[in-house]
Amino acid sequence: MPVFTHLDDDRARMVDVSAKGEVYRKAVATGTITLRPDTLSAIRDGTVVKGNVLATARVAATLAIKDTPRLIPMCHAIPVHGIDITFDYTKTGITATVTVISAGKTGVEMEALVGVSTALLTIWDMVKSAEKDEKGQYPVTGISDIRVLEKVKQDL
């Protein structure tokens, strides 16, 4: 049976990491948003009414990464030393990849996942008017495959 460090007698608690040493931490997470072809073209061409979609998604992801401990209750507040956010167009959407770097007592996987999720949600928000069908539904739009691609932990 797996051991869950954030549960104590079925009560949620924040794990004490004070005795751990600081080490280099890196996490890379990715996820994809599926969009209509016309929407992808509008993003590429810079004609989305709300503005520069990917620049806005990059800023939103950066802010979310810094706010991760406020969003994920048992996540420790750790120093974030570096963030890299990239976007790649696919045939049917956009893939966001977020890298977070720290030197701390705990990993940065949650920060990377929150960053990817927020980037993709921001893209959706900025293009939702173009993605809706005549009934106000989103038959094409979807967010998928959010996952951690890489986790690094090395002594300093």
Swiss-Prot record:
The keyword Amino-acid biosynthesis does not apply. GO terms for biological process: Mo-molybdopterin cofactor biosynthetic process. Disulfide bonds: none annotated. CDD domains: MoaC_A (cd01419). Keywords: Lyase, Molybdenum cofactor biosynthesis. Gene3D superfamilies: Molybdopterin cofactor biosynthesis C (MoaC) domain. It comes from the Archaea. Its EC number is 4.6.1.17. InterPro entries: Mo_CF_biosynth-C_arc, MoaC, MoaC_sf, Mopterin_CF_biosynth-C_dom. It catalyses: (8S)-3',8-cyclo-7,8-dihydroguanosine 5'-triphosphate = cyclic pyranopterin phosphate + diphosphate. Pathway: Cofactor biosynthesis; molybdopterin biosynthesis. GO terms for molecular function: cyclic pyranopterin monophosphate synthase activity. The active site is at 125. Substrate binds at residues 74-76, 110-111. It is an enzyme of class 4 (lyase). Belongs to the MoaC family. Catalyzes the conversion of (8S)-3',8-cyclo-7,8-dihydroguanosine 5'-triphosphate to cyclic pyranopterin monophosphate (cPMP). Homohexamer; trimer of dimers. This is Probable cyclic pyranopterin monophosphate synthase. It comes from Methanospirillum hungatei JF-1 (strain ATCC 27890 / DSM 864 / NBRC 100397 / JF-1). The gene is moaC.
